[in-house]
Design a protein with these regions (language model features):
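Asp-box/BNR beta-propeller blade signature and adjacent active/binding-site loops
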Residues: 1-152
Length: 152
């Protein structure tokens, strides 16, 4: 099953699912727990999405801004443990200016297994930054009130 995350013209992300490899999409919905960029604008900010390879689990990690200001700042990551239905935990990666982001997960059976790599515009030196973290670090974040973190 494929999850598609779309950047709409409002302050929340929209999602859809495909069961045929992306040929068709259904279950369009607004994801209330996922902000789409700074909340004082009618447009969003490109975010990242990756799946962690954890046997028996469907863990997604999403990156985007988490600010109510009209500024692009506070790049934050969130985790879902149920294929994107809920997003119960978030953690701030960088508190300053930040914007577009993309992510990838490490490959099973390599030294990168278990790591998430977040590339984002901004950071302590401006330009672009790559942050590396794992699920244990993200789980030390803030509960969002959207679902529960399962025992892992």
């Amino acid at each position: 099953r494929i999850h598609w995350d779309k950047r709409p013209n409002n302050t929340r992300r929209r999602g859809a699912y495909s069961k045929d490899g992306g040929q068709t999409w259904g279950d369009w919905h607004i994801i209330e727990a996922l902000p789409d960029g700074h909340q004082q604008r009618s447009y969003g900010c490109m975010g990242g999405l990756t799946r962690l390879a954890v046997k028996g689990r469907d863990i997604l990690v999403f990156s985007n801004l988490d600010t109510s200001n009209a500024k692009r700042e506070k790049i934050t990551v969130r985790a879902s443990f149920d294929a994107g239905k809920t997003w119960p935990v978030k953690r701030l990666v960088f508190d300053g200016p930040s914007a577009y982001s993309s992510m990838t997960s490490g490959r099973p059976g390599t030294d990168t297994e278990g790591w998430v790599y977040l590339h984002f515009e901004g950071g302590p030196k401006g330009g672009s930054t790559v942050a590396k973290f794992n699920l244990a670090w993200l789980l030390e974040g803030t509960p969002t009130g959207d679902g529960a973190v399962p025992r892992l």
